[in-house]
């Protein structure tokens, strides 16, 4: 899936966060958005994810203009996002976290926990994640919690995955593991948007830099 942003402008009152931004994200590439805090990187991705509406400009998927009125529209179009601050509930299990908001249902619409567990196992096996579907989120290290967020996006068929400052809370070892995961995802055809201000990490993993 090829994703394009053309002339995206986003204002908040008198402040212009994004001024006529053009960006192309190619299929299977890791595209880094490099810049200091406050540069407008996260705002631009929130526009792409449907959390903000652009004041000007267009989003195109495979050359076709699309409009996202909310994150649900972006998810349906194949876009996933892992926020810097994870959107997880500590007392939920991994499987419950994956199912939340997108519940695999059984007969009569009842949530199928086994189906949710199966999803975790399948996606984890595909990318070499070590995730126990029945583990509680609050018992997982930060790196594993981040993988839960990635699995959650992939289980919704994300073809473009936005990672917002993903290494900010990781140890050096967890950062190296994430770099490996990103490359595996890209090699499988998933496009990665890597928001960061760390040049060393960009040099290590990015195919393109903006």
For each feature predicted by the language model, list its residue ranges.
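Glycine-rich phosphate-binding loops of nucleotide-dependent enzymes
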Residues: 1-210
């Amino acid at each position: 899936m090829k994703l394009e942003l053309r002339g995206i402008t986003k204002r908040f009152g008198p402040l212009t966060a994004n001024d006529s931004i053009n960006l192309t994200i190619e299929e299977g590439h890791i595209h880094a958005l490099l810049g200091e805090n406050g540069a407008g990187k996260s705002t631009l991705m929130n526009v792409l994810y449907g959390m903000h509406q652009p004041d000007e400009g267009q989003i195109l998927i495979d050359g076709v203009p699309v409009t996202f009125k909310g994150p649900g529209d972006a998810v349906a179009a194949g876009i996933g996002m892992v926020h810097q601050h994870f959107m997880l509930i500590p007392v939920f299990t991994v499987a419950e976290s994956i199912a939340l908001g997108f519940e695999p249902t059984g007969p009569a619409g009842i949530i199928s926990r086994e189906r949710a567990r199966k999803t975790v196992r399948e996606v984890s096996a595909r990318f070499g994640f070590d995730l126990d579907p029945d583990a509680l989120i609050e018992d997982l290290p930060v790196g594993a919690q981040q993988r839960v967020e990635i699995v959650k996006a992939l289980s919704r068929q994300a073809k473009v995955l936005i990672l917002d400052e993903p290494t900010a809370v990781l140890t050096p070892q967890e950062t190296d593991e994430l770099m490996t995961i990103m490359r595996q995802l890209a090699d499988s055809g998933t496009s990665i948007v890597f928001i960061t201000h760390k040049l060393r990490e960009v040099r290590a993993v990015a195919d393109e830099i903006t």
